[in-house]
């Protein structure tokens, strides 16, 4: 971006610039996000005395920046809003997301069946609320047919609870 003036580095950025390079060389397969996490932990573990030279350097850079760009004002770029999708497409996407969320996992969560997927997913996206699944206690080694039957009973129980809640509102 031409004409863009970067902000001066803060103390952490001054310190992490060299540390990031070292960490990346020592761990070539480490992802940048992991390196950032490690740097954050390391920075927090430093004492004030260990951090002081980096704060001083950051202050020096800030002063130089102010002299070089006297009219500089930090103006973060705002994200451009993406236009809303059509209702039908929102339902399809929400339904697919919900279906993926509701697949069996190691915690054995209850599953909403059939047409309730699309309705629940659409309601979730419409109300901007998350759908919370309740864990189900099923003993290890439980036969698959009984697991499914147990799930259906849990689903019926969940529906009854929801109907009772709607009656009170």
From Swiss-Prot:
Region (Sufficient for interaction with KPNB1): 4-81
Stored Gene3D superfamilies: High mobility group box domain
Cited Pfam families: HMG_box (PF00505)
Protein origin, superkingdom: Eukaryota
Positions of the DNA-binding region: 5-73
PTM remark: Acetylation of Lys-81 contributes to its nuclear localization and enhances its interaction with KPNB1. Deacetylated by HDAC3.
Region of interest (Necessary for interaction with SLC9A3R2 and nuclear accumulation of SLC9A3R2), residue spans: 94-138
Annotated region (Necessary for interaction with ZNF208 isoform KRAB-O), positions in chain: 92-144
Annotated region (Disordered), positions in chain: 144-169
In-chain residues carrying the UniProt-annotated modification N6-acetyllysine: 81
Keywords: Acetylation, Activator, Calmodulin-binding, Cytoplasm, Differentiation, DNA-binding, Nucleus, Repressor, Sexual differentiation, Transcription, Transcription regulation
GO terms under cellular component: cytoplasm; nuclear speck; nucleus; transcription regulator complex
Region (Sufficient for interaction with EP300): 52-84
PROSITE patterns, per database record: HMG_BOX_2 (PS50118)
GO molecular function: calmodulin binding; DNA binding; DNA binding, bending; DNA-binding transcription activator activity, RNA polymerase II-specific; DNA-binding transcription factor activity, RNA polymerase II-specific; DNA-binding transcription factor binding; enzyme binding; RNA polymerase II cis-regulatory region sequence-specific DNA binding
Tissue note: Expressed in the substantia nigra (at protein level).
Region: Required for nuclear localization, residue numbers: 6-22, 75-81
Major place of residence: nucleus
InterPro entries: HMG_box_dom, HMG_box_dom_sf, SRY-related_HMG-box_TF-like
Compartment(s) of residence: Nucleus speckle; Cytoplasm; Nucleus
Quaternary context: Interacts with CALM, EP300, HDAC3, KPNB1, ZNF208 isoform KRAB-O, SLC9A3R2 and WT1. The interaction with EP300 modulates its DNA-binding activity. The interaction with KPNB1 is sensitive to dissociation by Ran in the GTP-bound form. Interacts with PARP1; leading to impair its DNA-binding activity.
Summary of the function given for this chain in its UniProt record: Transcriptional regulator that controls a genetic switch in male development. It is necessary and sufficient for initiating male sex determination by directing the development of supporting cell precursors (pre-Sertoli cells) as Sertoli rather than granulosa cells. Involved in different aspects of gene regulation including promoter activation or repression. Binds to the DNA consensus sequence 5'-[AT]AACAA[AT]-3'. SRY HMG box recognizes DNA by partial intercalation in the minor groove and promotes DNA bending. Also involved in pre-mRNA splicing.
The protein's name: Sex-determining region Y protein
